[in-house]
Each structure stands twice: as C-alpha cells, then as structure tokens.
Amino acid sequence: MTASTIKALSAQLAAKEVSAEELARHYLSRIEAGAHLNAFTHVDAEATLAQARAADARIAAGNAAPLTGVPIAHKDVFVTRGWRATAGSKMLGNYVSPFDATVVERLGAAGMVTLGKTNMDEFAMGSSNENSAFGAVKNPWNLEHVPGGSSGGSAAAVAADLAPAATGTDTGGSIRQPASFSGITGIKPTYGRVSRYGMIAFASSLDQGGPMARTAEDCALLLSAMAGFDPRDSTSLEPGRGGDVEDFGRLLGQPLQGADAARPLAGLRIGLPKEYFGEGLADDVRTTVRAALAELEKLGATLVDISLPKTELSIPTYYVIAPAEASSNLSRFDGVRYGHRAAEYRDLADMYRKSRAEGFGWEVKRRILVGAYVLSHGYYDAYYLQAQKIRRIIAQDFQNVLAGANRQCDVIMGPVAPTVAWKLGEKTSDPVQMYLADIFTLSTSLAGLPGMSVPAGFGANGLPVGLQIIGNYFEEARMLQIAHAFQQATDWHHRQPAA
C-alpha cells in the first residue's frame, strides 16, 4: 500500500490487489496520524467507507471507470451533500450542504471516494493558510513553515500522502502557489473550463477549480473528469467554445509533433519573462528554476527571452477587482438565511453588524472594506473601471507573445513564487508582503489563462520549489504533456517529506 499516484492505485484496484474499502481505511488512518498538520476541517469515516463499499460493488459488477475507488479530498470551498462546507470560516462553521458542487458530483460519478474536507484560508482569501477559522495548516516538509494558500490543506494532504489527490481553487494563485510550496503538481485550467456551481464564491470572474496531485498524469485524469460545460454555471464555457468533454491526458508520453522519444520537446519554444527573473526573485528559487529549464533544454526545448511589461500592475489590479467582487458575494452572509448569527442583539441592524463582525476574520473584513470602497459612488470610475481596463491590457500582454503572426513562444515558464515557503507568522502582520508573494501568478488569473506548478527541486531549508507553466487558452493538454515529459526525466515529484 505504498503507491500514492492515482494511476498506480487504479491499477491495483483493477487487478483486485486491494479493495476500495481497504484503500479508504488506509488513508483515513493516515489522516488521523497526520492530524498535527491540520490539513482537514472535517472527516466522516462512515460516509467515506459507505462510498468505498459502493465503489467495490461497481468494480465487482464490471462497471468501473479509471477513477472508481480512488480516494480524494475536497477543498472545503466545494459544497458536498451531507457534509459540512465551511469555506474555512466561522460564518459557515455549522453549514451542512443539501447538494453537491458540480466538481464533487462529477468526481463522485467517476467513482471517487471522498476522504474529507481540507482546510483553507477563509473564503479562499490568503496565501499561507493562516487565515482559517480552524487554525493554520503546517507544511509537511517543515512544520514551522506555511504550506501556501488558499488551498493549503489540499496541498499538505497530498504532499504528506494523507490523500492521493485533492481538489483546489485558484483565484490569484491558490492552486499553483501551495503546490509549489508543498512539492506537488497542481493545475489551474482556463477560466470557465471547470464549473463553479457549488463552489463558495470569492471573486466570481477569477475563481477556478482544478486538481492537485503528485504527478501531471494524475492531474490529467482528474481534470478530464472535472471539466466540461455545466448549464448551472453562467460562466461555464459552452461546447465548441472550450466546454467540451476532453481527454487531457491524450498527449501524455507522446513527443511533440516533429520530435522523437530522445528529445520529446524538440521544437518547443519556452518564453522566459524578464519580469519573472528580476531582483525580487530569491537566489535559491532562481537557481532551482534555471536548473529545471536546463533540463527542459536537454529534452529539446528552446529558451526565448520575452517581456510581460504590465506584470507589476497585476497586484494593484487584482486587489481592486477581487475585493470588489468579494464584497458583493459575501453580502449574502447576514445571519438571516444561513451562516453565523449573533446570540445577542438589539435590533435587525445590530444583528447584521454583530453576526458579520463575529463570523468573518480580519483578512476577510479587510477585503470587504476595500471592495465596498472601490465600488462606492465617486470611486467606482477611478478604481474599479480603471482596474478592469488594466486587466484587459495585462491579458493582451500574454497574447502578444503567445498568439498571432508575431508569436514569440509556445508556452511561458518561470517561478511560481519569489521565495520558498516562509515561516508561520512571518508575514501575518504585513498583508502587503503577503500579497507580493503572488506577483508571478496573479496576471495569469486576471487573463483567465491556464497555469500549473510542477515540482522542480528544493531551495533554502530543504523546502520545495515549483516551476510554473503558462499556456494560451485551452492548451491544458499540451501543458500537461510538457509537464509529464519533464517528470519522466526528473524525480522531484516522487520526493516525499520525512515521516
């Protein structure tokens, strides 16, 4: 029971070397043993084992799919029928969902077994998983450091082998950054590829769900099950426009067109933005990423210097748009319809004030205030509309190098974050420093492009470093193909933290 990749577990289940119930019990015991990481907010062993037994019956009847019986953990932002769905907040501490999110529904239809709900920054607002009402998550590689956020619980669970895979969400880097900090693989698809129905909203024009696992191959299997048009999500891409059901693993193991097995990436042009390799990049991260790029050159790729000149504007742009959308989305949590309600209050207005004051944490309150300010009369044009204009310019930066007659490269690569994971508590007193940690991921989210992180080595204090791969719209299959080729030539994705 040492295998921890989805592909290996699926093969064991198909060969009847192990049952789904045995797998579920194995991972439930690992979750219990790894409780010190605080990666999970909720586990329901009986519900998990019931799903596992149903998967075993499906396998016995010959109706199994490739994912049937494989366990998975869900970020606690995806509602799951009969399970608590807290979004890491006291505001939703006792909320039990009557329905499944589309992501949960589709993975369940594929036969996957839910292990539990993973910890996260409150309402996905954070880069360290220290903003959770249920306490901070610890990085399995060094318990004094953060795992990244906001999908830190999912990243820590996969890294520590408490789960072979997990779901995450990425608004400004919340799949890629924790994947990098925790030494696993994670992909944020093109905006609209994965349904947001049943995903508790932070910033609706940015939020996107995606898979987190040990390998690119596993992420491809998961994304194939998760993605596709959903009429219940108004932002879901329609069939023929990116919303088709797709086999994202179809190119894995194949050399690029015109290449061969010895040099599978021959002809690939990798763009290196000069803005991603400037003075703000830590030396250990720079060295590790450069070594990974050298490995890709050995596989036949060519490195090309490019520029994304509006990168520096991504932080102020994001921190106008995202809080504005958050202030609107979170207005529904008033203590009346659902969510935390204050025990004592004078009147209705006092109940609203006290319920929200008690239910929301400081970072969420900060972003609600910022969002309400930039949407207010007199400031809407000056801030929000200007930010939306800059957002379009940032998106055009990417198209200038990835598309058109003057296309300079096929994919873009660089670091995921400027540093390795920092120590718990190191940046909580200075939110701006925390925000700067997302400088290399925010622009991709603002543009709606797919991006992923793959393990690329280790930096200071033996902490993982991720290599970021950014593609043009709908190019996830090629990104996964490239990531898989890199992982076939390296073993960073197989490294695990000490028990």
Curated annotation (Swiss-Prot):
One of its GO terms (molecular function) is glutaminyl-tRNA synthase (glutamine-hydrolyzing) activity. Its EC number is 6.3.5.7. Coiled coil: none annotated. The keyword Chloroplast does not apply. HAMAP family: GatA. One of its GO terms (biological process) is translation. InterPro entries: Amidase, Amidase_CS, Amidase_dom, AS_sf, GatA. It is an enzyme of class 6 (ligase). PANTHER family: GLUTAMYL-TRNA(GLN) AMIDOTRANSFERASE SUBUNIT A, TRANSAMIDASE. The active site is at K75 (charge relay system), S150 (charge relay system), S174 (acyl-ester intermediate). Belongs to the amidase family. GatA subfamily. Allows the formation of correctly charged Gln-tRNA(Gln) through the transamidation of misacylated Glu-tRNA(Gln) in organisms which lack glutaminyl-tRNA synthetase. The reaction takes place in the presence of glutamine and ATP through an activated gamma-phospho-Glu-tRNA(Gln). Pfam families: Amidase (PF01425). Keywords: ATP-binding, Ligase, Nucleotide-binding, Protein biosynthesis. The gene is gatA. This is Glutamyl-tRNA(Gln) amidotransferase subunit A. Heterotrimer of A, B and C subunits. NCBIfam families: gatA.
